[in-house]
Regions:
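A short, aliphatic-rich alpha-helical micro-motif
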Residues: 60, 169-170
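Short, well-ordered alpha-helix to beta-strand connector turns
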Residues: 63, 172-173
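Structured loop/turn residues at beta-strand edges in well-structured enzyme cores
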Residues: 103, 170-171
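Residue-level signal for threonine
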Residues: 166
Length: 177
């Protein structure tokens, strides 16, 4: 069994399967202290100094329409210092410093073909502060792979597979995943 979403998922694996359990089968690598301030500062340093692209402070500006794409609940991470909560707060702070207005920011859960993220899951993932900052104004949504009014047809692959993209993501000027 392994962690999946909010529970455990069982699977039968061949005897030859190598199973990696962090901290058990292999020692955990050294990591940052897990307090909010340490994680926030380390994340901010990374966001301000990205590899291979300009920092948000140069990409975003007043009038930018921004979406922040967030993994769904299947990816876990509901603790107070979860990477999602820390990185979203850092990104928001950087966007605000660059002149982006709150009303121009959308948070979208990227659940792919999983069921849509419901309101209760959104609040669990984001925590009360982030949820209450954006949900009342309608600035949190969930991708819906069956809502063709909010999908953009980008054509097909060389094999003929359709390529569809979420319209909210397609229409925005700055996307941060």
């Amino acid at each position: 069994e392994f962690e999946y979403g909010q529970g455990l998922l069982g699977a039968e694996l061949p005897d030859s399967t190598d199973i990696f359990i962090p901290g058990e089968t292999v020692a955990d690598p050294p990591c940052l202290p897990q307090d909010w301030d340490s994680l926030y500062e380390a994340t901010k340093k990374s966001v301000q100094n990205p590899i291979g692209m300009e920092p948000l402070s140069k990409l975003a500006h007043k009038g930018s329409k921004v979406t922040i794409v967030i993994p769904d609940i299947v990816k876990g991470g509901l603790q107070e210092t979860a990477h999602r909560r820390v990185s979203i707060r850092v990104i928001l702070d950087e966007l605000y410093k660059a002149g982006v207005e709150k009303r121009d920011i959308l948070l979208i859960f990227s659940n792919g073909l999983h069921p849509r993220t419901n309101v209760e899951e959104m609040q669990k993932i984001l925590g009360d502060a982030l949820f209450n900052e954006f949900y009342p104004s309608g600035q949190i949504t969930s991708h819906d792979s069956e809502d063709y009014d909010h999908l953009v047809d980008l054509g097909t692959t060389d094999r003929g597979d359709p390529v569809l993209m979420n319209k909210y993501v397609y229409d925005l000027s700055l996307i941060h995943i």
